[in-house]
Curated annotation (Swiss-Prot):
This is ABC transporter G family member 25. Signal peptide: none annotated. Its main location: membrane. It comes from Arabidopsis thaliana (Mouse-ear cress). SMART domains: AAA. The chain crosses the membrane at residues 374-394, 406-426, 437-457, 489-509, 522-542, 547-567, 629-649. SUPFAM superfamilies: P-loop containing nucleoside triphosphate hydrolases. InterPro entries: AAA+_ATPase, ABC2_TM, ABC_transporter-like_ATP-bd, ABCG_dom, ABCG_transporters, P-loop_NTPase. Residues 1-30 are annotated as: Disordered. Keywords: Abscisic acid signaling pathway, ATP-binding, Cell membrane, Glycoprotein, Membrane, Nucleotide-binding, Stress response, Transmembrane, Transmembrane helix, Transport. Disruption phenotype: Hypersensitivity to abscisic acid (ABA). The lineage of its organism: Eukaryota, Viridiplantae, Streptophyta, Embryophyta, Tracheophyta.
């Protein structure tokens, strides 16, 4: 029995020849067939990872108790774990392959390997596309759908796919053609009824799980991939939704000549019948690869058959788990079943599979077509220009973030704070220096903590989507980052400007349009600097919980050294106030209200040297105002430092994002 019955006929048959469209710029011709056929081969694929651990389990307990450790306690043992071991298979254009196996069998690792997403010395073996190595050009024709649906929840289905089309389709296509391509994919995958519904997620009500999975597939179909790899696309779907989704995938393979590979955990019998080729994994080793219709006959030939009629997929998964019910009651234990099947595969099936792969060759005519189509004529595969990427990403960001930036609770938070400040300091007297200094410092605290804390979640929350889109080459890092910078300028400044507008005139701070505009400018610059701190910490740590803790401690240090709470900062901590955004904002707000300092000293009854004969306490207060409130940092120096922080923190955030591998 041949593992790949009829492979040679399919490779040389009429279905494998490329189908050229009359006008490659039309969306229907762009999506109706593969630009070139892809034959995927993988031979003896192995993947190993090294696990580092302590040789003595008591080492961690000793560290917690503060006990001394022996040199032997610090010796680390390195264990190498094999995820994949000698996996071999092949799939031709127009075929639908399913990778079966229990959890932890290596299905996702194999799919990442064949999709070109695993690199390094840990991966060995051959992975060939059209008898050649994986290249950047072939990766551009490979679509990868992850198990999790990584989509923006506030965008509608249409908006999601339109933005993808504008970013991923070649720049040679006009905008109208790209929009029609998005509409074509929406219609093809049956998303028309929900195209104007938000995608949603666990917390936001939106489309169903099956529809969300089809949106993820449409995300990749827009580039018209010749090879489509899907990691457990039916996970979380009911039987009917899973069947409809698999029917769609089978239609892409059989009707459009695409090469489709998917992993699936536990398919129904109806779903199993749609697979052309099945590959069964168990603990990283292959137990079967071949036509799905031949699987039961093969296992019967090696001594394993079900005692009663059952779903073939369930029987295969039982075998992969090392369990076989021979009479409906007893079970053979796992080691015997698994080892027997591995030995049978290595002896009977593996040689036939490798021979079939060796004798099948990709037609030279098709190879020349691929080279011409990708490198020469036809539609160029260049992505959008940098400026176009910036505009599209900025538009998408504004649509997605408007719900977060102008959330009702967030607006209530700012309005409530503004009203409380206005009532607490209602028409305060210009000579009530201590009261007004308290208000100015409260403003510095509130608009330092709030923007930094909100910004710290930006990049950690988008990490998964950002990594996937960068891996698919949708845009450059610089355009993505610049879109976030510009988006924050337009959205994050509305609330602080509204807060100050109400509070300033309710409190009746220094009258005049010029002092108000100066105060507003300082506050907005301070908000952007504080936001930059949050972006930098979030990008550097990339863990929302840890980053929020770090930014809270950092802002606490900035507040304590801001020049209001402590009369005399310890000499060892003086440096902290000079890196504090709160320190410079507070200095500027005081300077705008009371000038260079002579006026505020005069109001307190201090002479030019900061002395007063009334009492020692009052004299100490004068010295505090003179040394800490007025200080030795000028207005222009403070403005310059805030601008430096505004740019510096964002540069650090950009450099931190460059570390992320995709």
């Amino acid at each position: 029995m041949s593992a790949f019955d009829g492979v040679e006929n399919q490779m040389n048959g009429p279905d494998s020849s490329p189908r050229l469209s009359q006008d490659p710029r039309e969306p229907r011709s762009l999506l109706s067939s593969s630009c070139f056929p892809i034959t995927l081969k993988f031979v003896d694929v192995c993947y190993r990872v090294k696990i580092h651990g302590m040789s003595n389990d008591s080492c961690n307990i000793k560290k917690l108790l503060g006990l001394k450790q022996k040199p032997s306690d610090e010796t680390r043992s390195t264990e190498e774990r094999t995820i994949l071991s000698g996996v071999t298979g092949m799939i031709s254009p127009g075929e639908f392959m399913a990778v079966l196996g229990p959890s932890g069998s290596g299905k996702s690792t194999l799919l990442n390997a064949v999709a070109g997403r695993l690199h390094g010395s840990n991966l060995t073996g051959k992975i060939l596309i059209n008898d050649g190595k994986i290249t950047k050009q072939t990766l551009k024709r490979t679509g990868f759908v992850a198990q999790d649906d990584l989509l923006y929840p506030h965008l509608t289905v249409r908006e999601t796919l339109v933005f993808v089309a504008l970013l991923r389709l070649p720049r040679s296509l006009t905008r109208d053609v790209k929009l029609r391509a998005a509409e074509s994919v929406i219609s093809e995958l049956g998303l028309t009824k929900c195209e104007n519904t938000v995608v949603g997620n666990t917390f936001i009500r939106g489309i169903s799980g099956g529809e969300r999975k089809r949106v993820s597939i449409a995300h990749e179909l827009l580039i018209n991939p010749s090879l489509l790899v899907l990691d457990e696309p039916t996970s979380g779907l009911d039987a009917t939704a899973a069947l409809r989704l698999v029917q769609t995938l089978a239609g892409l393979a059989h009707g459009k000549g695409k090469t489709v590979v998917t992993s699936i955990h536990q398919p129904s019998s109806r779903v199993f019948q749609m697979f052309d080729t099945v590959l069964l994994l168990s603990e990283g080793k292959c137990l079967f690869v071949g036509k799905g219709r031949d699987a039961m006959a093969y296992f019967e030939s090696v001594g394993f058959s079900p005692a009663f009629p059952m779903n073939p997929a369930d029987f295969l998964l039982d075998l992969a788990n090392g369990v076989c019910q021979t009479d409906g009651v007893t079970e053979r234990e796992k080691p015997n079943v698994r080892q027997t099947l591995v030995t049978a595969y290595d002896t009977l099936l593996a040689p036939q599979v490798k021979t079939c792969i060796e004798v099948s060759h990709f037609p030279q005519d098709n190879a020349r077509f691929v080279k011409t189509r990708v490198n020469g004529g036809g539609i160029t595969t260049c992505i959008a220009t940098w400026f176009s990427q910036l505009c599209i990403l900025l538009h998408r960001l504004l649509k997605e973030r408007r719900h977060e930036s102008f959330d009702l609770l967030r607006i209530f938070q700012v309005v409530a704070a503004s009203i409380l400040c206005g009532l607490m300091w209602w028409h305060s007297d210009y000579r009530d220096v201590h009261d007004r200094l308290g208000l100015l410092f409260f403003i510095s605290i509130f608009w330092g903590v709030l923007p930094s804390f909100n910004a710290v979640f930006t990049f950690p929350q988008e990490r998964a989507i950002f990594t996937r889109e960068r891996a698919s080459g949708m845009y450059t890092l610089s355009s993505y980052f610049m879109a976030h910078v510009l988006g924050s300028l337009s959205m994050e400044l509305v609330l602080p400007a509204s807060f100050l507008t109400f509070t300033y005139w309710m409190v009746y701070l220094r009258p005049g349009i010029v002092p108000f505009l100066l105060t507003l400018s300082v506050l907005l610059l301070y908000v952007l600097a504080s936001q930059g701190l949050g972006l930098a910490l979030g990008a550097a740590i990339m863990d929302a919980k840890k980053a929020s803790t770090i930014v809270t401690v950092t802002m606490l240090a900035f507040v304590l050294t801001g020049g209001y709470y402590v009369n005399k900062v310890p000499s060892g901590m003086v440096w902290m106030k000079y890196v504090s955004t709160t320190f410079y904002c507070y200095r500027l707000l005081v300077a705008i209200q009371y000038g260079s300092g002579e006026e505020i000293l005069r109001m307190l009854g201090c002479d030019s040297k900061g002395k007063q004969g009334a009492s020692a306490a009052t004299s100490a207060g004068c010295r505090f105002v003179e040394e800490e409130v007025i200080g030795d940092v000028g207005m222009w120096t403070s403005v310059g430092v805030l601008f430096l922080m505004f740019f510096g923190y964002r540069v650090l955030a950009y450099l931190a994002l460059r570390r992320i591998k995709h």
